[in-house]
């Protein structure tokens, strides 16, 4: 919130109509989904005159869709926000329902292929994609360690030993609790790389508490009982356009850098 945001942009506030002058003026910095949803809720309350400033030439932020060209077979691709589920994102789902943004089930799974090992998360046929893993003791031990690692969420999220969990890194925890290199290299590190596009060194240096909290919230510690992931029909640009349509004309000002 600001009364005088930036240089020449003060004119945007001075040009409010008579009805807006009776409302409290609010400036939202950034037209990503957080800024747009905040502006939408403020506008819906009918108590605020909202102006949104975005330094980029377009609104959306992390929700960025690269549209297909005219070539046959090409698809629109989301570069940032891609999927959500009905369990972890109740507020986002509520926003979609209010704006009548359509969504559909996504085909999403996890799989690993290394020089000697392959496995995936889609049922037993995926886990044992390589039949030789049925008699591979290292692979079976990895399954046991996945189940063991799943239980750490109860300790991390219980609130006990708060300082311990906040200081402990992923690498330290794995070493101190006897997890195998096979489990680390064929489960934990590939999962981190898939989610955050990070290298092994960075992943092992992650603080354990936020990592486990994120995995637990997204049901990534489960092997079979994972949520159904969904995607916005028409990609993320569709919900950005829906929010913009629900806001007053001209209240979102792109290409305006706030100092």
Locate the predicted segments by residue.
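Eukaryotic N-terminal low-complexity, Ser/Thr- and Lys/Arg-rich leader segments
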Residues: 1-25
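Glycine-rich FAD pyrophosphate-binding loop
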Residues: 43-69
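General small-molecule cofactor/ligand-binding pocket signal
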Residues: 51, 104, 251-255
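N-terminal glycine-rich dinucleotide-binding loop that anchors FAD/FMN and/or NAD(P) in oxidoreductases
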Residues: 65-92
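Mobile amphipathic helical/loop "lid" adjacent to a hydrophobic cofactor/ligand pocket
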Residues: 86-213, 217
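Helical element adjacent to the flavin cofactor pocket in flavoenzyme catalytic cores
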Residues: 213-259
């Amino acid at each position: 919130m600001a009364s005088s945001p930036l240089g020449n942009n003060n004119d945007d506030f001075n040009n409010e109509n008579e009805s807006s002058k009776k409302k409290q003026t609010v400036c939202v910095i950034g037209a990503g989904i957080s800024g747009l949803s905040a502006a939408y809720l403020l506008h819906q309350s009918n108590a605020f005159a909202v102006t949104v400033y975005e330094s980029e030439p377009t609104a959306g932020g992390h929700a960025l869709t690269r549209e297909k060209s005219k070539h046959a077979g090409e698809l629109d691709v989301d570069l940032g926000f891609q999927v959500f589920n009905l369990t972890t994102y109740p507020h986002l789902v509520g926003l979609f329902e209010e704006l009548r943004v359509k969504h559909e089930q996504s085909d999403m799974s996890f799989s690993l292929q290394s020089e000697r090992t392959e496995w995936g998360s889609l049922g037993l046929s995926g886990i044992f994609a390589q039949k030789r893993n049925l008699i591979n003791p290292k692979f079976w031990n990895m399954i046991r360690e996945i189940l063991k690692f799943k239980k750490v969420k109860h300790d991390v999220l219980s609130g006990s030993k708060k300082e311990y969990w906040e200081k402990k890194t992923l690498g330290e925890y794995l070493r101190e609790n006897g997890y195998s290199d096979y489990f680390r290299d064929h489960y934990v590190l590939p999962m981190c790389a898939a989610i955050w596009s990070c290298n092994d060194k960075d992943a092992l240096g992650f603080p354990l508490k936020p990592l486990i909290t994120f995995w637990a919230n997204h049901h990534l510690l489960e092997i079979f009982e994972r949520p159904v992931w969904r995607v916005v029909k028409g990609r993320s640009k569709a919900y950005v356009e829906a929010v913009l349509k629900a806001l007053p004309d001209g209240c979102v000002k792109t290409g305006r850098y706030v100092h």
